[in-house]
A protein has these predicted regions:
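Acidic/His- and Gly-rich active-site-bordering loop/insert found
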Residues: 2-112, 133-136, 316-318, 337
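Metal-dependent amide/peptide-bond hydrolase catalytic core
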Residues: 1-5, 12, 59, 90, ...
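A structural signal for isolated positions on well-ordered beta-strands in alpha/beta enzyme cores
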Residues: 81, 142-144, 238, 291
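Phosphate-handling active-site elements
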Residues: 105-107, 127-142, 226-235, 384
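Short glycine-aspartate micro-motif
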Residues: 79-81, 109, 172-176, 194-196
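Active-site metal-binding loops of divalent metal-dependent hydrolases
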Residues: 29, 86, 149, 179, ...
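Acidic/histidine-rich catalytic neighborhood of metal-dependent amide-processing enzymes
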Residues: 117-190
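Hydrophobic/aromatic beta-strand patches that form the interior of the parallel beta-sheet core
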Residues: 80-82, 144, 173-175, 346-351
Length: 384
C-alpha cells in the first residue's frame, strides 16, 4: 500500500461521497438547535461505527455534543488530527426544501455548510475511508466534530474547545477543515472580541429635547470613534447591532450596541481593550454614562515558526504527489485553529472544499474540490 493507491481510491469513492456531502448538508444544523446539531453529528458517527473506529464524546447540555473519531486507535504513533464544525448559521428552512441543490452542468453544489464547514468534514471522512480501505494502519487519524464554532463556543462555555485541545495535544499536525482559498493554506487569523456598550442618558419629552441627554446620540458618537478602525491587515470594527429609545417623541434614556472588533496580534488586542475603555468612559455629549462588557472572544492565530515548518513540509508532500502547490495565507475571520495553535500544536487551517458566498443563502462549492481536498488531507496524514 502506498500513497498513490490512496489517492486513486479517493477518486473511486468521490461520487459516492458527493452523495454523503449532499445528505449531510440536507440535515440543517443551526448552532442554537442542539437536537439538530446532534442529528447531523450522528450521521457522520454512523459511518465511524460501521468501520469500527473509536468514538469519544463531550456531552453538552446547551450546545450540540462534540466528538472525536479515531481510526488506528491502537497505534503508538503520534496522531494527525482533522477537524470541522457541524453547526451552521441559518435557521431551518432558509434554503427551502431540500436545502441542497446540485448543478452538475456547472459542477457546483449549493446549500448550508457545503463549504463552512460540513464540506470539510466530508472531505476528511473521505480521506479516512480511503486510507482505511487501502489498509493504512501506521498512525492514528482523528476527526474531531466541533458543535458550536459559529458562536465562538459560548453555549458550551468553551468546553468544546477544551475537548478539541485534549484530543489533539500530542498531534504531529492539526489540520482544520475550514473553507479552502485556492492556492493558500491559512497559518494566521485575526482574533475577534465583541463588546456590548450600554449607555444611559437623561429622558425628557422631545418638546424639551434641549434639556435631555440622548443615549442614542451618545451611541452615535461612540460608534463613529470605534468605526475608525478599518485596517485590512490590523484592527477593524463593525457595530452591527443597536437598540434604544421608546417613542419618537421621547429623548432616549437607554441605548445598547455591539461592536465586533478584529485584531491581528495580542499587542493589538491590548490596545483595543484600552481604547474601548476610553471610549466608554468618555461622554461625548456630556451628562451620559456607559458600561461596557465582553460578549464573546476568539483569540488570534499569529504566524509562528512551528506552523510555518508544518506548511513547508505539506508543500513538499504536495509536490511529491503532483498536488497543486499552496502558499501561506491569512484570514480576517476567526477559527478554532487559533486555539490549537495557541496550545502549541502544529496547525494549518483551511484544507477543505472550495467555493464561495459563505454564510449566505447562496453558499456553494465546486464538486471536484471534495476529492481534491481529501487528497490533500490523506497525503499529509500518511507522509507528515
Amino acid at each position: 500500500m502506498n500513497t498513490e493507491m490512496v489517492l486513486n481510491k479517493i477518486d473511486e469513492l468521490s461520487e459516492e461521497y458527493i452523495g454523503v456531502w449532499e445528505s449531510f448538508c440536507n440535515i440543517e444544523s443551526p448552532t442554537s438547535d442542539k437536537a439538530a446539531v446532534d442529528e447531523a453529528s450522528e450521521y457522520i458517527l454512523s459511518f465511524a461505527r460501521k468501520k469500527g473506529w473509536d468514538i469519544t464524546e463531550s456531552i453538552q447540555s446547551v450546545s450540540g455534543n462534540a466528538y472525536c473519531i479515531t481510526m488506528n486507535a491502537d497505534s503508538a504513533e503520534k496522531p494527525v488530527c482533522l477537524s470541522g464544525h457541524v453547526d451552521t448559521v441559518h435557521p431551518k428552512g432558509d434554503f427551502g426544501y431540500p436545502p441542497v441543490k446540485i448543478d452538475r452542468e456547472a459542477g457546483k453544489i449549493y446549500g448550508p455548510g457545503v463549504v463552512d464547514c460540513k464540506g470539510g468534514i466530508v472531505s476528511a471522512l473521505l480521506a479516512m475511508t480511503a486510507l482505511s480501505e487501502c489498509g493504512y494502519n501506521k498512525r492514528p487519524i482523528k476527526l474531531i466534530l466541533q458543535s458550536d464554532e459559529e458562536i465562538s463556543s459560548i453555549s458550551s462555555d468553551k468546553k468544546t474547545i477544551e475537548f478539541m485541545r485534549d484530543c489533539s495535544l500530542d498531534a504531529s499536525a492539526f489540520l482544520n477543515c475550514e473553507g479552502y482559498s485556492k492556492g493558500k493554506l491559512v497559518i494566521q487569523r485575526k482574533g475577534i472580541i465583541r463588546f456590548v456598550f450600554d449607555i444611559k442618558g437623561v429622558v425628557v419629552h422631545s418638546a424639551l429635547c434641549y434639556n435631555g441627554k440622548s443615549a442614542i446620540l451618545e451611541a452615535a458618537h461612540k460608534i463613529i470613534e470605534l468605526e475608525k478602525w478599518k485596517d485590512r491587515d490590523g484592527i477593524t470594527c463593525n457595530c452591527g447591532i443597536i437598540s434604544g429609545g421608546t417613542t419618537p417623541n421621547t429623548v432616549s434614556e437607554n441605548c445598547s450596541f455591539v461592536a465586533d472588533i478584529r485584531y491581528a496580534t495580542e499587542s493589538e488586542l491590548e490596545y483595543v481593550k484600552k481604547r474601548v475603555a476610553e471610549i466608554a468612559e468618555t461622554s461625548y455629549i456630556g451628562g451620559t454614562s456607559c458600561s461596557v462588557s465582553v460578549k464573546s472572544e476568539r483569540i488570534c492565530m499569529e504566524k509562528n515558526e512551528r506552523n510555518m515548518n508544518l506548511l513547508k513540509r505539506i508543500r513538499e508532500i504536495f509536490a511529491k504527489y503532483g498536488i497543486a502547490d499552496v502558499e501561506p495565507g491569512g484570514s480576517n475571520g476567526g477559527s478554532d485553529a487559533a486555539w490549537m495553535s495557541y496550545y502549541g500544536i502544529p496547525t494549518v487551517d483551511s484544507i477543505c472544499t472550495c467555493g464561495g458566498s459563505i454564510h449566505s443563502k447562496n453558499e456553494w462549492a465546486w464538486l471536484g474540490s471534495l476529492a481534491d481536498s481529501a487528497k490533500m488531507l490523506a497525503s499529509v496524514a500518511m507522509e507528515i
